[in-house]
């Protein structure tokens, strides 16, 4: 059996009882270590809590070396651990399909992730649209396909969850080209850098899917004892020190409910200004009034 087990957001104890019991019966345990990190638990703490050796599975092992993960999983129990929920990345779906193609039994054990815990900032989950990822820009690569998704969400009044990039055990382009197994230090995108990149692409596109004055919520270390929320405009959050990782951002939709706004006021420096920013943003994206069709005189 190949178990896919979600670990939750922060602590070794966030795992479900069912997930922990599954780990204890596995002969091999892998921890996916490149789409997210468990913020407050080290590898050693996980191994002590599980009573099992845990092998870190980086991008290369999961995407290129799946043979190692799937080895003998049709004969013995193997666990693949994922921070948050199991299906937070398409890579995990691909791994499930590979296992099923080999007739390896698969069991999925879910857990909390940023996709549902984001509601703790006060925004209602059913008011969210498409989620996007913001990657680190480079001198030669500044992708902006996510811009269209924000535009689509905002046109129909929905919030946009922005997942901020992390780089763990990544190689530079030069080292990859030279075949050198030298890895860059870990990097975690800050709220300020995300907002700067948002503003850069808006200036390039110029269709005003959002503006510097669009209201947002900065989310830091979600699910931990030190989690924080900060409400402000993109321009304001581009100067915000969000502290230690991990971080996410929510761009508000124009249909923000009054209860959502009331909740967000707890995280503002200037409540009256934030209410005005929200009102202005909602007015900008307000659809034209409905005009009934002319009656047929016949």
From Swiss-Prot:
MF annotations from Gene Ontology: diphthine methyl ester synthase activity
User: What is the top-level taxon of the source organism?
Assistant: Eukaryota
Protein location = Cytoplasm
Q: Which reaction does it catalyse?
A: 2-[(3S)-amino-3-carboxypropyl]-L-histidyl-[translation elongation factor 2] + 4 S-adenosyl-L-methionine = diphthine methyl ester-[translation elongation factor 2] + 4 S-adenosyl-L-homocysteine + 3 H(+)
Q: Which residues bind S-adenosyl-L-methionine?
A: 9, 85, 88, 113-114, 164, 222, 247
Work out whether the entry's keyword set contains Cytoplasm: yes
Protein's GO biological process: methylation; protein histidyl modification to diphthamide
Cellular component GO terms held in the UniProt record: cytoplasm
Q: Which Pfam family, any one of them, does this sequence belong to?
A: TP_methylase
InterPro entries the record matches: 4pyrrol_Mease (IPR000878), 4pyrrol_Methylase_sf (IPR035996), 4pyrrole_Mease_sub1 (IPR014777), 4pyrrole_Mease_sub2 (IPR014776), Dphthn_synthase (IPR004551)
Its pathway, per UniProt, is: Protein modification; peptidyl-diphthamide biosynthesis
**What keywords are annotated for this sequence in UniProt?**
Cytoplasm, Methyltransferase, S-adenosyl-L-methionine, Transferase
EC nos? 2.1.1.314
The UniProt family comment states:
Belongs to the diphthine synthase family.
Query: Briefly, what is this protein's role?
Result: S-adenosyl-L-methionine-dependent methyltransferase that catalyzes four methylations of the modified target histidine residue in translation elongation factor 2 (EF-2), to form an intermediate called diphthine methyl ester. The four successive methylation reactions represent the second step of diphthamide biosynthesis.
Q: What is this protein called?
A: Diphthine methyl ester synthase
């Amino acid at each position: 059996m190949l178990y896919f087990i979600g670990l939750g957001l922060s602590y070794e104890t966030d795992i479900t009882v069912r997930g922990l019991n599954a780990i204890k019966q596995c002969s091999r345990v892998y921890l996916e270590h490149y789409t997210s990190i468990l913020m407050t638990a080290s590898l050693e703490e996980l191994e002590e809590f599980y009573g099992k050796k845990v092998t870190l599975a980086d991008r290369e092992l999961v995407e290129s070396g799946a043979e190692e993960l799937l080895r003998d999983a049709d004969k013995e129990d193997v666990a693949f651990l994922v921070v948050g929920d199991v299906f937070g990345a398409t890579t995990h779906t691909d791994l499930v399909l590979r296992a099923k193609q080999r007739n390896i039994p698969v069991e999925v054990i879910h857990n909390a992730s940023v996709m549902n815990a984001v509601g703790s900032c006060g925004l209602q989950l059913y008011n969210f649209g498409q989620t996007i990822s913001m990657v680190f820009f480079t001198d030669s690569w500044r992708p902006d396909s996510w811009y269209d998704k924000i535009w689509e969400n905002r046109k129909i009044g929905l919030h946009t969850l922005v997942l901020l990039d992390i780089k763990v055990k990544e190689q530079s382009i030069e080292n990859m080209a030279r075949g050198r197994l030298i890895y860059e230090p870990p990097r975690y995108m800050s709220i300020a850098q995300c907002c700067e990149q948002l503003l850069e692409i808006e200036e390039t596109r110029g269709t005003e899917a959002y503006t510097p004055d669009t209201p947002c919520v900065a989310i830091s270390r979600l699910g931990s004892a030190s989690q924080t929320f900060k409400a402000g405009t993109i321009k304001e959050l581009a100067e915000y020190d969000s502290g230690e990782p991990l971080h996410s951002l929510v761009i508000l939709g124009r249909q923000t409910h009054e209860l959502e706004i009331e909740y967000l006021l707890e995280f503002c420096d200037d409540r009256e200004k934030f209410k005005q920013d929200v009102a202005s943003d909602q007015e900008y994206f307000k659809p034209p009034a409905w005009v009934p069709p002319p009656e047929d005189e016949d």
